[in-house]
Amino acid sequence: MLSPKRTKFRKQQRGRMRGVATRGNKIAFGQFALQAQDCGWVTSRQIEASRRAMTRYVKRGGQIWIRIFPDKPVTMRPAETRMGSGKGNPEFWVAVVKPGRILFEMGGDEITEAIAKEAMRLAQYKLPVKTKFISLDEDLNKGNYKPAKTPVTADDSESSS
């Protein structure tokens, strides 16, 4: 399962999940993606279960990219422990997910939209956040990806005047 090799501090505060994802909210590697619709913590076990569900469905067909990483330690106290005596020990790792964040991407020559949709649906069941399936074509149509500006040539400037 995923976890950081080393961290600066062993324990973190729980924090708040406000707003939407400003980074990691566009498709970067594949043609299809699973995008979070609400906020939550996704544990390393849930990420691994989703990954296994997708890879088993697509077999050797395409490639899967995991776009989230569990870098936040969650501490827990032993059961039936009295209050006080410090913070508990780190038990598991979570990835903080905000709305709009891309969780998984999928692509490849043999991956059709139907195959990707079904594989992502199987992965959705393993996750604690509400998600939706998006494709690169939809994102291009929405205007999320702006093409690089083309330089104006001398021929273009003469014809416009």
From Swiss-Prot:
Please name the SUPFAM superfamilies in this protein's record.
Answer: Ribosomal protein L16p/L10e (SSF54686)
GO terms (molecular function) for this protein are: rRNA binding; structural constituent of ribosome; tRNA binding
Question: Does the keyword section mention Transferase?
Answer: no
Keywords recorded for this protein, A-Z: Ribonucleoprotein, Ribosomal protein, RNA-binding, rRNA-binding, tRNA-binding
Q: Name one GO cellular component term.
A: ribosome
On whether Ribosomal protein is a keyword of this UniProt record, the answer is yes
- Mind listing the GO biological process terms from this record? translation
All disulfide bonds of the chain are none
Q: Which Gene3D superfamilies match?
A: Ribosomal protein L10e/L16 (3.90.1170.10)
Q: Identify the PROSITE patterns for this entry.
A: RIBOSOMAL_L16_1, RIBOSOMAL_L16_2
Question: Region Disordered: what ranges?
Answer: 140-161
Q: Which family does it belong to?
A: Belongs to the universal ribosomal protein uL16 family.
> What NCBIfam families does the annotation carry?
rplP_bact (TIGR01164)
Database matches in PANTHER family: 50S/60S RIBOSOMAL PROTEIN L16 (PTHR12220), LARGE RIBOSOMAL SUBUNIT PROTEIN UL16M (PTHR12220:SF13)
Q: How does it assemble?
A: Part of the 50S ribosomal subunit.
Tell me the function of this protein: Binds 23S rRNA and is also seen to make contacts with the A and possibly P site tRNAs.
Name recorded for this polypeptide: Large ribosomal subunit protein uL16
Species assigned in the record = Prochlorococcus marinus (strain NATL2A)
Q: Which gene encodes it?
A: rplP
